[in-house]
Amino acid sequence: MLTPPWQVVECQFDVKHECLNIYLDFLRGSHFPCPDCGQEDCAVHDTENKSWRHLNFFQHETFMYARVTRIKCSNCGVRLINVPWARADSGFTLLFEAYIMMLAPSMPVQRISELVSEHDTRLWRPIHHHVKEAREQADHSDVKKVGVDETSSKRGHNYVSIFVDLEKSKTVFATEGKDNTTVERFKDDLCKHGGDPEAITDVSCDMSPAFIKGVEENLPNAEITFDKFHVLKTLNEAVDEVRRQEQKG
């Protein structure tokens, strides 16, 4: 994470605020590559003081501080360099962001914010960045068997439909709504990531007419299988209805 010419020049523990402060600096006379065109050995123009939240040191919050250089490139002019321990314009180190991304699949972002003592708005920024980056690199060329189900995203009737690669147990697409157009949007996204709608052989879903219609219209070679949970749910509801009718009789 920390590479030459960067080095730790001082560490201070703030007893009052119970946090560790780490100060970084570059070696005098250092030159840096241009962040835009890559030209090597650009001279330092000036510096900007910046700080980043880092992984905790034991139970104590840790912050890193550095004079980040602006270089003068003969091609691009004055540019702020990229530091090796953080993304551009991020207030967190890469290791702290990695920790957030490790927690995100298993708990709400609000709970993460409480755990790390950061506002959830700040946490959503790196989450959105890394999810977008991962989505752009996603390859769905081998997706053949898909499961789809809807879930309520908020109180009320705001639904999200989630599509899962059943062979890899991996979510490949999520979209608002639960009508037949959700399958159409899945098909479009599948194509954008190297997938083939005609290569989908199986779809597992509930008995929603909307999902059935969407599959028939957009995944022509897919065989629909109703998932066990919804089949048993419908069966139990029918048994309960018969029982009520018998009790009335």
Label each PLM-derived region with a short phrase.
Residues 38-41, 51-158, 198:
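Short, positively charged, Gly/Tyr-enriched micro-motifs
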Residues 206, 216-249:
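Conserved beta-strand -> loop -> alpha-helix junction used to position metal-binding or nucleic-acid-contacting
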Residues 2-5:
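Edge strands and adjacent loops of beta-rich recognition modules
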Residues 12-15, 103, 107, 114-116, ...:
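Secondary-structure boundary/capping micro-motif
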Residues 29-32, 70:
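Residues immediately within or flanking Cys/His clusters that coordinate Zn2+
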Residues 124-202, 209-214, 241:
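RNase H-like nuclease fold core
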Residues 11-23, 48-62:
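Short Cys/His-rich Zn2+-coordinating modules
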